[in-house]
Regions:
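Residue-level detector of conserved, function-critical positions
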Residues: 1-187
């Protein structure tokens, strides 16, 4: 176009194979990821659609296509565009919380012959931690949700951080400043 802000594809003879109406066209192996108006699609090298336009960031890796949805969930498709997993979890971590108990760590001192000469305690106490009831899972990089001990998803991945503040109490941060306190049932 005249603004030169849209992209298309032409063949070796200069014929338009894909009109210049896309915000971006990214080749990957024998595919193209095309972007238009905040949506993306995957096309074959013959420009046949594998995935229709969707509000997602799409990437191709190995033998699959991963879609990062606007709600921070991940979906996985095969290279024929068939949905393999509609809720992909990239990582699961246990959560630890500080108890009321504190500990002082000590270091033992020995002489050259290996005889104990004394112990020194660190000045700063360390809070004793225990494992919380729930776990946190990660979908899109940096977005977390709560998961039950048995692996059931409790909340969608709408938090930028989750910290256990008790055995079954969690501070779920929606940004650097705001958050909400939830229990293991997500309320």
């Amino acid at each position: 176009n005249n603004k030169r802000d849209k992209f298309g594809l032409i063949d070796k003879k200069g014929n338009w194979m894909l009109k210049a109406e896309y915000d971006a066209i990214s080749p990957k192996d024998s595919f193209f990821v095309v972007s238009k108006g905040g949506m993306q699609s995957v096309l074959t090298e013959n420009l046949k659609p594998i995935l229709p336009f969707m509000e997602a960031d799409l990437w191709i890796s190995g033998n699959s296509i991963t879609a990062t949805m606007k709600d921070h969930t991940l979906r996985k498709y095969n290279l024929q565009g068939e949905l393999i997993d509609d809720f992909l979890i990239s990582n699961v971590d246990r959560l630890l919380y500080d108890t009321d108990e504190i500990r002082y760590t000590t270091a033992k001192n020995y002489d050259d012959e290996g005889n104990l000469t004394g112990e020194t305690a660190e000045a700063e106490p360390t809070p004793y931690q225990k494992t919380a009831n729930c776990k946190k899972y990660e979908a899109e990089l940096g977005w977390y949700g709560l998961m039950s001990p048995s692996g059931k998803v409790i909340t969608p991945p709408r938090y930028c951080d989750i910290t256990a503040i008790g055995y079954d109490l969690y501070l779920c941060k929606t940004d650097d400043i705001r958050g909400e306190v939830l229990n293991g049932k997500g309320v």
